[in-house]
C-alpha cells in the first residue's frame, strides 16, 4: 500500500480512491463523496485530483469559527440545511456556548444595515477582511436574513440588555467588532417637555424672618451671590454682527465681540421680571405702604427708602453719566451702539468732549436715540459703551466701585433693609439663581424706571450676577408691552415666556401675548415660585 501525505489534514490512500475524503480538523467537516464532481465509476489519479476544481472547498483560515455558534445556517438560496457539528479549533482554548441573538423590538432592520445586537460573549479574532456570514436573529417579527460582517455591528450597552451577559470575555478586547457608542432611538420625556403643572395647592407656613447678628464682612459675602454656569444670553453677550442684543437688526456695526456659545434663538425659556415691588422693595418704602401693610415702623421704612434712593442716584450721576443721559434715555443699552465707531476710550475725556454744548436742545433727544448731528450721536454712544463696561466690571463688586467709606454705609443699609422686609430680596435671589443655573433659561428685566437709575438699582441690590446688562429694558417711554414685543423678537417665537410681576401693566401685556403670568404680592408668592422652579414646573 502506497500512502502519499499531502498535508496534515489530507490523506490519499491508493486502495480507497473511490472513498476519497478530505478530513478537516476545524469547526466544519467537508466530505467530497457527498459533493458534486466525485464519482465512483472513474477512479481519479492524484494529478487529476489536484487539477480538478472543487467549488465547495474553501481555503483554510486560521481560528475561524464560522459555524461554531450553534445556530441554524442558511445558504444563499434561503434554504435550511442541517447544522454541522461544532468542533473547537485546536488553537482555541475555550468553547463558545450556543445562544440566540435577540433583536430589540423597537429597532427596524433592513438589508444593508448593521443590526444593533447585544453579544454577551466575545468571538475569536478573525483575520482582516473576513467575508460576511449569514446569521439568524430570532425576534417577534420572524427571522431576518442579512449578510452582516461583525465589523459593522454595534452593540448595546449593558443597561439596554434584558438578559444577563456572558462573563469572562469583555467586548472591549475586540474594538474592531463593536462601535464606540450606541445612541438610543428614543428621547427621554424630560427633554421633550417640562413636567406638567401640578394641581396641588401650595400651603406655606409663615416662618419667622429674623436676621441674626452678622458682621459687615459676612453680610457682604452673603449678598455676593454665586455665579451659575455661563448660559446663552447671560455672561459675555455683547453686540452681534447681524442682530443686536436687544433684538433689533443692525445695518452696520462698528464693534463686535465673540458671541456666546449658543445664540438667543436657542433659549428655551425666558423669565421676564418686574423690578420694584417684585424683586426688590423700594417705592413702597418711600410711601410707607409696605410698613403699614406688614405692621412695620413707618419712620424707619421711609428713612431706609430715602437713604437707598440717595445711593442710587449718587451712583448713577457719579459713574453712569446720568446727568448727561437723563434727557436722552434709551430703552436698551445697545440702542445707539450702531453710532459707535469703536474708538479707544481709555484716555477719552468725557467732561471735555463738548457733549452738552453740541446738543441743540434736550427736547430733541428722543427715546429712540435720534438726535441731530452725527458727532453728537457718536459721543452719546461712547457714554453708553462706558456704562456697559462699568456695569460688567463691577456687577459682582459694587463696593469696589463706590469706594470704602460708602461701602460700609451700603452694607449697613442692606442689612437694615433685609430685616425690615423680612428677607424679601433673599427669597427673590433664590428664584433668580435657580433660573440662572439652567443652561437654556434666562432672566430678563423690564422696569418702568429709566435705564441708568435701573442699572444703579440692580448693582446696589446685588442683582448684577443674574441680570446681564443686555437683558435689562426700560419701559419708561414705550411701555412694557412694547418691551415684551422686542424680547419676543430677540429670543424667537419658539421660546416659552413667563412674566413675573405685581402690576396690572405687565399682567395685561402678558395676557395679550399669551404669556403665563406669575403674580408676586407677598412672601408666600416668592416661596411658591421658588418651589415650582425647584420641581421644574416652570
From Swiss-Prot:
Xref: Pfam families: Hydrolase
Compositionally biased intervals (Basic and acidic residues): 234-249
Keywords: Activator, Chromatin regulator, Cytoplasm, Developmental protein, DNA damage, DNA repair, Hydrolase, Magnesium, Metal-binding, Nucleus, Protein phosphatase, Transcription, Transcription regulation
Gene Ontology CC: one annotated term: cytosol
Record function comment: Functions both as protein phosphatase and as transcriptional coactivator for SIX1, and probably also for SIX2, SIX4 and SIX5. Tyrosine phosphatase that dephosphorylates 'Tyr-142' of histone H2AX (H2AXY142ph) and promotes efficient DNA repair via the recruitment of DNA repair complexes containing MDC1. 'Tyr-142' phosphorylation of histone H2AX plays a central role in DNA repair and acts as a mark that distinguishes between apoptotic and repair responses to genotoxic stress. Its function as histone phosphatase may contribute to its function in transcription regulation during organogenesis.
Family, similarity comment: Belongs to the HAD-like hydrolase superfamily. EYA family.
Name of the molecule in the record: Protein phosphatase EYA2
Originating organism: Homo sapiens
Gene name of the encoded protein: EYA2
